[in-house]
């Protein structure tokens, strides 16, 4: 769902396991949230701070034309 989130994880060599630990959640929960876009505001803020990018960039979605 969030291609830039996937890209930043790859650039920083992060896995669902390490990201889940950082957000204090199970890796499976993190993976589900990544797929369905259900991050809380607090979780989204932690992710943007961790990767050092803007919310708009990290959570940009593809727009179909």
Predicted regions and their residues:
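A short, Lys/Arg-rich alpha-helix, primarily the initiator
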Residues: 1-14, 18
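Alpha-helical residues within the helix-turn-helix
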Residues: 10, 21, 49
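Residue-level signal for the short linker/turn that defines the boundary of a DNA-recognition helix
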Residues: 13-14, 39-42
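Recognition helix of helix-turn-helix/homeodomain-like DNA-binding domains
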Residues: 25-39
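DNA major-groove recognition helix of helix-turn-helix
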Residues: 34, 43, 62
């Amino acid at each position: 769902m969030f291609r830039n989130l996937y890209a930043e994880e790859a650039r920083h060599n992060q896995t669902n396991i390490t990201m889940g630990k950082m957000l204090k959640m199970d890796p499976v929960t993190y993976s589900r949230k990544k797929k369905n876009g259900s991050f809380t505001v607090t979780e989204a803020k932690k992710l943007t701070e961790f990767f050092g990018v803007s919310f708009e960039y990290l959570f940009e979605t593809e727009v179909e034309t």
